[in-house]
């Protein structure tokens, strides 16, 4: 079930505060965050985020095509090792 349109997208308050401060100062340093649930908004375009995947921080550069998705979608938490190949 998707989020109600009247509520709008969820973005962590501390994260949006950091993005707005960076926009005012016109700085583009990476923003470290644990908020994988935050939705990417148009004002985040061009910023670099370091999103935590449970073990380490993965670098995510936000582009126009990412708007509307969540930050966690771009930092996978599981590593798939291929199935073993049977010899014989």
Swiss-Prot record:
Species this chain originates from: Chlamydia abortus (strain DSM 27085 / S26/3) (Chlamydophila abortus)
PANTHER family per record: RIBOSOMAL PROTEIN S19P FAMILY MEMBER, SMALL RIBOSOMAL SUBUNIT PROTEIN US19M
Gene3D superfamilies: 30s Ribosomal Protein S19, Chain A
Sequence similarity: Belongs to the universal ribosomal protein uS19 family.
GO molecular function, one term: structural constituent of ribosome
Gene: rpsS
GO biological process, one term: translation
Protein's name according to its UniProt entry: Small ribosomal subunit protein uS19
Superkingdom, natural source: Bacteria
Function: Protein S19 forms a complex with S13 that binds strongly to the 16S ribosomal RNA.
Keyword terms, alphabetized: Ribonucleoprotein, Ribosomal protein, RNA-binding, rRNA-binding
Presence of keyword Ligase: no
One GO cellular component term: cytoplasm
Pfam families: Ribosomal_S19 (PF00203)
């Amino acid at each position: 079930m998707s989020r109600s349109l009247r509520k709008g997208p969820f973005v962590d308050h501390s994260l949006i505060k950091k993005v707005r401060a960076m926009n005012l100062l016109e700085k583009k340093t990476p923003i470290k965050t644990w908020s994988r649930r935050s939705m990417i908004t148009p004002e985040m375009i061009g910023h670099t985020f370091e999103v935590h995947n449970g073990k380490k921080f993965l670098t995510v550069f936000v582009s126009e095509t990412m708007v509307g998705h969540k930050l966690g979608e771009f930092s996978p938490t599981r590593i798939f090792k291929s199935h073993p190949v049977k010899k014989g």
